[in-house]
Regions:
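Electropositive phosphate-/nucleotide-binding environments in soluble metabolic enzymes
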Residues: 29, 33, 37, 58-62, ...
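Short gly/ser/thr-rich secondary-structure transition/capping motifs
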Residues: 1-6
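Short beta-strand segments
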Residues: 24, 82-86, 115-122
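Glycine-rich phosphate/diphosphate-binding loop of Rossmann-like nucleotide-binding domains
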Residues: 10-59
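Glycine-rich oxoanion-binding loops at beta->alpha junctions
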Residues: 56-74, 119-126
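Generic secondary-structure signature for well-ordered alpha-helical cores
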Residues: 29, 44-49, 69-76, 106-110, ...
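Glycine-rich phosphate-binding loop
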Residues: 63-105
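C-terminal binding/interaction regions
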Residues: 94-95, 99-136
Length: 136
C-alpha cells in the first residue's frame, strides 16, 4: 500500500475524526517538546484535526501511566501518545523509572482497551535523546 515514490512503508492511514491525546513529561521538556512536535506533525499527516488533539503534561515519565489510564477511562479519546525522556545517571533510578513507565503504560491500555503508545526515550546521554527527538 505504499505509493510509488513514497519513502514510507506504512499503509495509507486516515485519522479523520479520531480524538488523540498527547501526554508529555515535563522532565527534560526541551527534548519532550521535540517529540511532541514530531507527534503533531505525524497526526497532521494522518488528517487528525487540531481540535481533536488533547494535550496534557505531567511532572515526569513515572507519572505518564496514571495520567494515561485516567484519561482513557473518560472515554473522550480514541488513543493516547505518551512522551517522555529518561536519561541514565549514576544510580539505579533510571531502571526503576523506565521499567515502571513501560509497565504502567502497557497496563493502562490493557485495562482500558484504549491504545496507549510508548513514546518514552530511554537513553544513556542527553545527546542520544536530542539525536532521537529531532525532525526525521
Amino acid at each position: 500500500m505504499t505509493r510509488a515514490g513514497s519513502s514510507s512503508a506504512l499503509p495509507d492511514l486516515d485519522g479523520s475524526g479520531l480524538r488523540i491525546a498527547i501526554i508529555g513529561a515535563r522532565f527534560n521538556d526541551h527534548i519532550v517538546t521535540n517529540l511532541r512536535d514530531g507527534a503533531l506533525r505525524g497526526l497532521e499527516r494522518l488528517n487528525v484535526a487540531d481540535g481533536d488533539i488533547l494535550e496534557s503534561w505531567v511532572p515526569g515519565a513515572f507519572e505518564l501511566p496514571l495520567a494515561a489510564k485516567a484519561l482513557a477511562e473518560t472515554g473522550k479519546v480514541d488513543a493516547i501518545i505518551c512522551l517522555g525522556t529518561v536519561i541514565r545517571g549514576d544510580t539505579p533510578h533510571f531502571d526503576y523509572v523506565c521499567n515502571e513507565a513501560a509497565r504502567g503504560i502497557q497496563d493502562a491500555q490493557l485495562a482500558t482497551g484504549i491504545p496507549v503508545m510508548f513514546g518514552v526515550l530511554t537513553v544513556n546521554t542527553e545527546q542520544q535523546a536530542l539525536d532521537r527527538s529531532g525532525p526525521g
